Amino acid sequence: MKFQGVVTPDGLFVDLWGPVSGTRHDNYMLAQSGLMPKLATLISPSGHPYCLYGDPAYGLSNHLVCPFSAASVGPLSPEMADFNKRMSHCRVTVEWGFKEMTGLWAFVNMKPQQKFLLSPVAKQYRVATLLSNWHSCLDGGNEISQYFGVLPPTFEEYLCV
């Protein structure tokens, strides 16, 4: 069983989709999640469309970039290899987000008790994601926000109160 998550440089999950069977391809999850059409409706404050950096399995689109592949473009130039190396450090931060969430909220990491379609796994992950975001706001950040040097909003800002 797996989930797809989007984490911003302030360390907060801004999108979570799943679960799907662990045997499903990542492209299936991306298509089913509706994430790309959502991104197409958003414009950044600079007027440019938002773009995510994702796993190579996702491929390229107007809103998604991935590492250069020697299989696709031939031998990588030094610039391409450098881009891949630097961006791989950014992509791993999503894994840090899931690691933090499952570390803080053990109930989402009890795989033997989680039965796909028989237990409320999706609800548990959504609750854990919300709690993790709250925890990061109340704690002044997390490993991801420290890595990027971007503070999360305050708890009050997050709740818009």
Could you say what each language-model-derived stretch is?
Residues M1-V161:
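Short, well-ordered secondary-structure "scaffold" segments embedded in the functional core
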